Amino acid sequence: MNASPHSKPSAALAPSPTAAFFPSTSRVYTSKAATVVDDDEALDEIRRYESFSTVDWVVDNTRERNRLARERQAASAHFVSSSSNAHLGNADAAWGHIGFGRGGVPPRWWSRGPWGRRAWLVWGIVKSASSAFTDSGVIVLVGILIGLNMGVISLATEWASDLKQGYCSSGWWLNQKFCCWEMMDQAGPGGAPLPAAAKALATATVTVTASIGAAAAATDSAPILPATPAATPTAAIRAVAQEAYNLTIRAIPDHQLWSRSAQDVIQDGFGTGLRLLSRAEGAASGAGDLSETCTDWVRWSKWSFPAWIIYMLFAGLLSFICAHLVKSFAPYAAGSGISEIKCILAGFVINGYLGFWTLAIKSLTLPLAIASGLSVGKEGPAVHVACCIGNVVASFFRSFNRSQAKMRELLTASSAAGVAVAFGSPIGGVLFSLEEMAYNFPASTMWRSFLCALAATVTLSFMNPFRTGKLVLFQVSYDRDWHYFEIMFYILIGIFGGLYGAFVIKYNLQVQSFRRSYLVKHGVSEVVVLATLTAFVGYANKFLRIDMTESLEILFRECEGGGDYDNLCQSWAQWRMVNSLLLATVLRTALVIVSYGCKVPAGIFVPSMAIGATFGRMVGILVKALYNAFPHWSLFSACQPDVPCITPGTYAFLGAAAALAGVTRITVAVVVIMFELTGALTYILPTMIVVGITKGVADWFSRGGIAEQMIKFSGYPFLDKDDHNFGIPVADVMRVCPQVLFASGMKLSELEGKLADGSYKGFPLVLAKHDATLLGYVGKVELRYAIGKARRARALDGDTLCLFSVGPNALDRADGVESSAHGAQQQQPDLLSVASLPTTAAADRAVREDMLSRFSGATGAGSASGLGSTSATGVASQRRHESESLIGQLDVEDDRSSAPSYRSRVDAGDNMSSSSDDDAVVGNAGGGVDGESDLDKLELGGWIDPTPLIVQPGMPLETVMDMFKNLGPRVILVVEYGRLSGLVTVKDVLKRIAMQEKAEAAARTAAAAGLPMSGSANSFTGEGAGAGGGELEALLKEAYEWAQEKWALISPRIERISARRASASRGGAPGSQAGQARYSHLRESTEDRYDDSDAVAEDMPMHSTRQTSATKNTRSEHHQFVLGAQDDDDE
């Protein structure tokens, strides 16, 4: 239902919104209806939702349904008006009856004849059809842009990562892989070596080329004849030599084939052969290191120590540039973004978080953050970037701008596309958005997520950024089956994944708490220190030195036919590999804990997968070593002798799945993502076993993944999907003294004073100060809009009486006046006001008819929807006394996020402006307001929502929590016997959840320590929730304080040294050596004397502080005097 914004209780009638669409039936209200639409358009320009407020989904859905209903009415108006023949008499006047709505009149140059009208009708149909396909077109466009963006980010990341180790001499823009493309196969670095025949071919190329050169030495310009290779003795060598000859001929351009010197032939032939030899023997010499076989790739230094220093310098430089850009231009670009996007999809508004600058800076700095070597990933930030693209693109389309529900669907689809291109898993991306991101996931959202993920994946596939046909670098395929005896080892990997997730989440939150307390002003320095420390620690370990995606590709690979890397598949080096992998697991876990959450784009998905992969590969190597040592054990009876029994790469693959599931607590999406990475149906069951065990172990320690825990840590108003058992009524958590407005009348100055309070987004409306009967709810922005319009229409002062008329007898009850004449005068306008409500659904019609029946009664006391009447006088008297005591104690206690008014539910735009900008916005808004003709009164009743969501005080809190989850309101009013008792918001429920969790944690701690349970009774008060620190936070705090103390001791010496150097540089001119020597001697003696006095002052009692300060001031004055004397000597 829609309360008309222009219902006047005096003589004027409120226009019906249908008058704008049915002029033939409501011509009396045509001008008023145009004013209604003007108000709607003006309010569309106002940003409806304030930053860090919550979207009311009940409001938004109602407004969207009514908007669609008005469009259908406008489209059907043509068929209503075209039944008459009026347009035949006056063609120009008939344009108003065509029924395309406002703005439907064609331009002046359009033909006014019959064919012109038909063409205009066809054009309207085309526009309607195109608008129907606009949504899908926007989804596809967003998906294409996401794919392009991720392709560019992948290439930039690879190039910047390789820049720390060297550069390509043939092109500075090429990374190591593209620079040495000829030296490796399609598998990339560490790929499979060439077969033995190719090695023989390369050797023959070198030999035959040498023979050709010797034969051609006699004649410097001798032609190269095809008969030369035929001189080889045997058929096998002849075939090899023939192929070598063909390679040599192809290496020589056609125009130089008959005029080449012997030296040129020898160089070309030897070059081709040596390249083939290098490629054939690449695996034996550590194919992962292309610098030994690729001459185009130049390392910064051939020595380990200088290369290590340069590696750290590049890491610090890249991290500094990244952190500085984020801090200077887009602070919202820091972090992963998953937690905030979950809250945004649930209705929490963060203005600028999905803006253009965030998109540009995060896309630019994400490759820098990954290339710096920080233990962070790009998959989480890829979701944030994808949502930024969706938001920026949708801002150009009005259909998305004015509907928060459609914008939510688009952002959900964008997040699915972001995961799809990050992991090369379109179906996994859709399931990720369903399982992790979406707060509400209807069927239409599923289709749009699928379409967007498909468009993004196809675009990335066309780009082919790695030139291998892979969407991501660590895609791999397995063709071997697993054995049932391996399930015990899979269980071990699953347990590790659960322990890893619980461990990382617990200690990362402690690091975040320490970072918030001590490192807020040192974000850039922290990032540089972390990057340098990571490079310092990880350079010696090859699994930490290389990029994490490349590390995953190497660890996932099979040994047989998959290539080797640093002897990873060699049996003689298995124990060295075990040690290296274990060290990499431990060190990267520690680095992830301290790095995730720093002020750069930072994800945790791929770092967790890299940790799980190193642990899993280690387990696989140990199992394979056990099989090689005891192949005849009954445990290995299922193994076939001629087929490799154990594949360590599959263990790495399962370890990555376990770690990812442990830190995110996602199950189905992880299984599908890992399946799409391998394409192996045989490993779905092991993956499900591992992920299921990981989920159980991790949830035993704590519930919720890293994203949910970060939401709680940040204090965002987000209700998770878990069920809670409170066992209390809603009255125990409601706000009992909310700010209210009085329908009996308020002075304009008093009303504006309440509007100036930034703690509220709206106010409940009660009958009067002495009667707390609830009449409705009104939003702050609507009131400011109406007052601003009224000020432009006529003069208003602070004593103007503001009225909120809802029913025909409401004001009479409030004033104690029962005037039948006045009531009769008001009755007709109120009936028409109610009749003008749009009827877009059967429920709306039923409520409207109920209101009509209530208002039409001659003796009935009017009541707003949702209010009950008190029949017993005793109960009424008691409730009136309670309401007087309630309303008399109104005050402002804390921030309260309330819903916008009913007017905004139906007609307004999608965003609220900030409270600081509201006055300026209202000043420029258009539209009208009720009661403009009365100089003493200002009627604002048309802006009231007469049907807010209400509950009884005794309703269980669990039911109210389900209402918040399923309906999505911002505020629910608590009403008893028709009178306002309080209100409850999402924050109230979250406070209760936090108190309950804290109490349960305190109880577990007390039980583990053997303390009595009464010691944790105060936990239920909720005080200090989340304020406690952990052991890691305490350790970091002690280290920080120790560093501050040491710096306080060192910094004065550094300052003195700097001052001496500065004075030496000033006194270095000829003729000033004497004065400089005298100054230095005097200053050193003075500093020694005052240093001794400072040492004595440190041992003085507290009452000597003033004396110490005077001593220091004297010292400072003496330094100034000495410097001044030196300046005089210099002059």
UniProtKB/Swiss-Prot annotation:
The chain crosses the membrane at residues 137-157, 206-226, 305-325, 341-361, 380-397, 414-434, 485-505, 518-538, 577-597, 603-623, 643-663, 680-702. GO terms for biological process: intracellular copper ion homeostasis; intracellular iron ion homeostasis. Residues 1104-1113 have a biased composition (Polar residues). GO terms for cellular component: chloride channel complex; early endosome; endoplasmic reticulum; fungal-type vacuole; Golgi apparatus; plasma membrane. Gene3D superfamilies: 3.10.580.20, 3.90.1280.20, Clc chloride channel. Residues 815-835, 858-928, 1061-1131 are annotated as: Disordered. It comes from the Eukaryota. Residues 866-877, 1061-1078 have a biased composition (Low complexity). The keyword Cell membrane does not apply. CDD domains: CBS_pair_voltage-gated_CLC_euk_bac, ClC_3_like. It holds the Pfam family Voltage_CLC. Residues 944-1000 form the CBS domain. Its main location: membrane. Keywords: Chloride, Chloride channel, Ion channel, Ion transport, Membrane, Transmembrane, Transmembrane helix, Transport. The keyword Transmembrane helix applies. SMART domains: CBS. Belongs to the chloride channel (TC 2.A.49) family. This is Probable chloride channel protein UM03490-D. It comes from Mycosarcoma maydis (Corn smut fungus). The lineage of its organism: Eukaryota, Fungi, Dikarya, Basidiomycota, Ustilaginomycotina.
